[in-house]
């Protein structure tokens, strides 16, 4: 946790980690001020029930951050490889532009903003889909993955700058914030 001083021992912040069924979250109504659902909804058959659970555990006036794969980079992955979307536990849906926004705003939440993220990840997944989704040891794929991990762990320098430039053009994810 060295990279996150707010989680360090001297901090007064508290946090916990757990695993739960997204359709039956083990929390009382109105528990959290902030809720993050990142890269989950595309895996769940009844994603609307998951959204209802997210809304249930969010306090009135709370903020929700949610991300899903962006439509067109994800569609390319599906077109390049049947294995990509036929993997057990994998992506079973592609969200169209504004679909997720409507799913939240129709339930009373107000969109604060949205942005795109992971611009360097789209070409990585296209490469994986072209060469074989399970072939992650192939030289180019393996080294590209190392580059992505290095950029995520220390997001500075030329690679991070290039990634930020690519985010609005071909970011793999769309991120929404709602109040």
Predicted features and spans:
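Conserved SAM-binding loop
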Residues: 1-77, 99, 176-179
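Residue-level signal for beta-strand positions within conserved beta-sheet cores that form or flank
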Residues: 11-13, 88, 110
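A short, basic/aromatic alpha-helical/loop segment that forms part
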Residues: 44, 94-95, 169-171
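Short, glycine-/aromatic-enriched active-site segment of Class I SAM-dependent methyltransferases
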Residues: 68-93, 101-103
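A C-terminal cap/extension of S-adenosyl-L-methionine-dependent methyltransferases
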Residues: 79, 118-179
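A structural motif corresponding to the C-terminal end of an alpha-helix
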Residues: 103-109
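Conserved S-adenosyl-L-methionine
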Residues: 109-119
């Amino acid at each position: 946790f060295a990279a996150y001083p707010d989680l360090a021992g001297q901090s007064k912040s508290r946090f916990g980690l757990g695993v739960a069924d997204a359709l039956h979250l083990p929390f009382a109504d109105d528990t959290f001020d902030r809720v993050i659902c990142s890269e989950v909804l595309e895996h769940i058959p009844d994603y609307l029930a998951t959204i209802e659970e997210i809304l249930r555990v969010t306090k009135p006036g709370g903020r929700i951050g949610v991300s899903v794969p962006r439509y067109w980079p994800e569609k390319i992955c599906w077109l390049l490889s049947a294995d990509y979307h036929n993997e057990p536990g994998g992506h079973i849906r592609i969200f169209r532009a504004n679909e997720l926004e409507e799913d939240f705003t129709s339930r009373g939440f107000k969109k604060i903003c949205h942005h795109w993220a992971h611009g360097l990840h789209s070409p990585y997944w296209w490469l994986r889909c072209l060469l074989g989704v399970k072939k992650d040891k192939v030289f180019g794929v393996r080294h590209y993955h190392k580059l992505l991990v290095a950029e995520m762990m220390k997001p500075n320098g030329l690679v991070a700058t290039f990634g930020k430039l690519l985010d609005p053009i071909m970011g793999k994810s769309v991120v929404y914030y709602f109040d």
